[in-house]
Every structure is written in structure tokens, then in C-alpha cells.
């Protein structure tokens, strides 16, 4: 009976308005070889807010774009992203839905990429952005070993938007 009361109390506390659902994750211990960014800098990124989705036709990849609170506030106010902003992109391989063949759905994660705005560490990068990419192969992540020059080159196309392609997608 004592265990039932304890379980019931824990259930009630977890369902109260005072608690928030939080995902706690342990990311791999990986570091980008060219700039020292670590996967752990986005520990618990699953709690970031989704602001956009994209489909990369060249990679046949669906991307969820998630941001930390600092970036979310700027996205919400339609402002350039400030120091401390973090943007995470999750790239999913897509597959045809088994029960609705005219639709595609996310299948397997192919990559986790992120950008962090840090004027101290990335003062020589356009917009003070640092870039990291962790590719998933055979169910294991590895650091991207081809550098970040391609990230910087591509994001230069979005110079007028603070080197960020995404804009917050309105849900209504």
C-alpha cells in the first residue's frame, strides 16, 4: 500500500502545472577537429523549440530546425540572432509512409548540425558563427572531418539574414 501511495504522489506531482516535461539526453563525446566545437555544447537540444522545417532536395533530407531560448526570442521578434544563439538542424532520411503512399516521413537521422553565435571564439567567421556537423553512419555518430569552410561558404548566401537561412514558420 505504501508503494501505491508513493507512485500516486509522484504521478500527481509530475502531472501538475508546476512541472514541465524535459528530455534529458547524453550526446556522444565528439569534437569538431577544425574548430573544437563539441557535440555536448548542445546537450539536451531535444528541449529546444522547433522553428522551421526544410526539405533538401539534393540530399533527399527532411530537416527540423530547433533553437535555444535566446534564438527563439529573436526569431519570434523577427530580429537578427544575438550572441549565445544556438541553432540545431536534424537531418532525416525520408521514406514513403507505409499506410499513405503519397506522403513521405522522417526515417533515420543522417546528421545533427549546429551553429553557435560566439564573438569570442568565432570572431574571424562571418557573423561570429561557429559550425559543427556530426554524421550518423551505421548507428554511430562521427565528427565531420572535412572542415567548416563549406558551411561558411553556404551561409554567406544568407548574409542579409544574419547568415541564417531559416525564418520562424507561423503555425496559424
Q: Whereabouts are the PLM-identified features?
A:
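Sequence context surrounding c-type heme c attachment/ligation sites in exported
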Residues: 19-35, 39-45, 49, 53-59, ...
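Short, structured beta-strand/loop micro-motifs enriched in basic residues and often containing a Trp
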Residues: 62-72
Amino acid at each position: 500500500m505504501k508503494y501505491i501511495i508513493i507512485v500516486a504522489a509522484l504521478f500527481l506531482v509530475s502531472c501538475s502545472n508546476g512541472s514541465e516535461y524535459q528530455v534529458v539526453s547524453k550526446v556522444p563525446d565528439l569534437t569538431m577537429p577544425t574548430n573544437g566545437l563539441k557535440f555536448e555544447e548542445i546537450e539536451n537540444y531535444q528541449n529546444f523549440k522547433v522553428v522551421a522545417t526544410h526539405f533538401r532536395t539534393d540530399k533527399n533530407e527532411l530537416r527540423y530546425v530547433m533553437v535555444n531560448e535566446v534564438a527563439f526570442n529573436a526569431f519570434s521578434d523577427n530580429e537578427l540572432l544575438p550572441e549565445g544563439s544556438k541553432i540545431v538542424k536534424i537531418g532525416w532520411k525520408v521514406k514513403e509512409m507505409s499506410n499513405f503512399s503519397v506522403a513521405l516521413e522522417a526515417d533515420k537521422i543522417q546528421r545533427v548540425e549546429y551553429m553557435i553565435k560566439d564573438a569570442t571564439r568565432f570572431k574571424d567567421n562571418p557573423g561570429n558563427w561557429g559550425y559543427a556537423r556530426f554524421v550518423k553512419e551505421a548507428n554511430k555518430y562521427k565528427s565531420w572531418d572535412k572542415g567548416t569552410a563549406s558551411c561558411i561558404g553556404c551561409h554567406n548566401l544568407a548574409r542579409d539574414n544574419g547568415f541564417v537561412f531559416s525564418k520562424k514558420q507561423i503555425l496559424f
